[in-house]
């Protein structure tokens, strides 16, 4: 995925856009980025400090079972205009000769998904434990939630010491965030297409 991100950065810069990668491959192999994303040089902090308008997070999806066909999934913020997310999904499907994901859970449109935190009463999940004031309709995915400030319900204030502090959680200047699942690594069809047609995927985005 890092190669994809570098390719996308180059394409966007060729269009005159300014792009910052929050991960460039220089990170230590044994570095657990889950627990340092809010550090001074962490991914969330870098994104928030960049002054960017938008954050795109590229991912390869997976599940427990090998599947024949996976497909593209674009995750967006709840209560937002999904026009851009729909455009991303359509472009990738058409230009990269892939398909929309068949997953129905969290689906808002073909290839477009909105997942929110479903907070249990006992706060047993690790990333909500000991926090108060978290409501169900905020984004589940941290890269969307924690880069959007007040607008997306960013809440990581150090209550759970394992995850640090998001110094931008109360910012009224947030980034518009999307997580792009290019396909499923446990689908041979998806994986081969991504490896063979990486340029088409990035051109679509």
Where are these regions (language model features)?
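Active-site-proximal helix/loop segments of hydrolytic enzymes
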Residues: 3-205
């Amino acid at each position: 995925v890092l190669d994809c991100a570098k390719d996308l950065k180059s394409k966007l810069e060729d269009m005159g856009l300014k792009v910052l990668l929050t991960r460039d491959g220089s990170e230590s192999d044994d570095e657990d980025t889950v627990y340092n994303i809010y550090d001074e040089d962490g991914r969330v902090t870098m994104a928030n400090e960049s002054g960017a308008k938008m954050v795109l997070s590229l991912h390869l999806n997976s599940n427990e079972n090998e599947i024949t066909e996976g497909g593209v999934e674009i995750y967006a913020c709840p209560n937002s205009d999904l026009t851009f997310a729909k455009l991303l999904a359509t472009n990738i499907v058409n230009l990269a000769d892939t398909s929309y994901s068949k997953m129905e859970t969290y689906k808002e449109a073909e290839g477009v998904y909105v997942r929110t935190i479903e907070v249990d009463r006992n706060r047993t999940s690790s990333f909500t434990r000991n926090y108060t004031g978290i409501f169900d309709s905020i984004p589940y995915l941290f890269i969307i939630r924690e880069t959007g400030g007040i607008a997306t319900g960013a809440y990581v204030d150090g209550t759970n010491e394992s995850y640090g502090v998001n110094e931008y959680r109360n910012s009224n200047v947030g980034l518009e965030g999307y997580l792009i699942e290019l396909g499923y690594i446990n689908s041979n069809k998806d994986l081969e297409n991504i490896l063979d047609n990486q340029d088409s995927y990035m051109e679509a985005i």
